[in-house]
């Protein structure tokens, strides 16, 4: 009679381990736990019902982690941030409130694809408030930004900065209405100073720069002509903004400017760096701090 071969202990242990893993996986699946990839690319490990993640841990591609509670409408982030609002497939979607623990800022409004997108109100801890549209968590489209120091901007934003047409009003009473690009005054605009003086013309990167501009002082004196680098200047410039010189080494001027005094008397001639060539005129243009 042949003796039965004894089973290899290692094989037995391996088989038992596989069985235990299968049982564990089966129980986990029965209880509704899943490991899935969310629409925003994050990984979710937790309980799901009818394909909807309802409770568990979210691991974002940035390394951030958060705890999801679908029924409580909350996502609590590891860094202390809290989202309260509509949740779809583990992502912020619909209306909600986002509280930022590090800064104390609060956003209340619309969300799409787990980003601040749509219309909403963003309140900064230092007192600034933005009301308007956002896209992918950046100010984009029409909005109103009220600064804690009393300044106010109303107009369009692109990629989180003032770009397009808008109006900026300083707490001092000065105002600018016109074009913006990359948060700076660019293109045609009208700048009204607290004193009542006014500039109408072109801006380049926050500076008065262009032809056919008009600067009117509160005392009714007026300058009609070109500006370069914030100053009255009739010299021509090339495509790089450099002043052009003629063959004789002298600067080349464009059209003559007209300076009208409050008495009605006028001076017609050329200007360089704010001064009339050969004539002394005392009026100075004004400045305000950048928005």
Model-derived segments and spans:
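Glycine/tyrosine- and acidic-biased, solvent-exposed loop/turn segments at the edges of beta-strands
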Residues: 2-291
